């Protein structure tokens, strides 16, 4: 259910950006999502279909690009991109990791008319 408020924010950001460019219509909203963002693109699309009615984003399509999980090992200092299902340092095997990224949910770009 949290996708409703997230979608409202995505819509607000997109409408402001489109208006600033003088665009009349938003065709595509491209998102960047970290593996721990908790955002389900299909849910965002469903809410956008409802929230976007009567706006420049009516009929817009969501495209999401998944970002990698980046960590730094607290033991050996190595930085790496890892799979969220295998959380350990690829260099030394330590489980003591500091997350550098992975919670992102950003509007990367718009395709507009």
Task: Enumerate the language-model features and the residues they cover.
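Cys/His-enriched microdomains
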Residues: 71, 87, 105
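Long, charged N-terminal interaction/targeting segments
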Residues: 1-59
